[in-house]
């Protein structure tokens, strides 16, 4: 299987929605990924095998020197072939080329080896507030 990686590549919402549902184990949703990434992201990486989208990662940013890895996903049939690390490597390259100095990621425990050993991230102290209603503490 030959994989190609494309920064800010074209994609169909349906293809990313299918990858997301499979990768994050939830029902298929109709998310408008085009609007989301064009409005809020530095870029994204598409991984393809021929014409098929087999991987995707979103790179959000603060408009300055911080970028954020979101929604790394690889189709089940294409996993354990280095595609995820290829997605992250392309994200690192293009975020750096855009002038970002820091690339952040958060992830579930079972992905620690992937992000730390395979992709080269290091552990940091970070904080998190759960926003169950989307409004946060002190919202009126």
Region roles according to the model:
Residues 80-93:
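Conserved acetyl-CoA-binding loop-helix of GNAT-fold acetyltransferases
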Residues 97, 101, 108-133:
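Conserved active-site alpha-helix within GNAT-family acetyltransferase domains
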Residues 32-50, 55-73:
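A conserved beta-strand-loop-helix scaffold within acyl/acetyltransferase catalytic domains
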Residues 1-31, 46, 137-140:
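Short amphipathic alpha-helix that is part of the acyltransferase structural core
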Residues 8, 70, 106-107:
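Small/polar loops that bind or transfer phosphate-bearing groups
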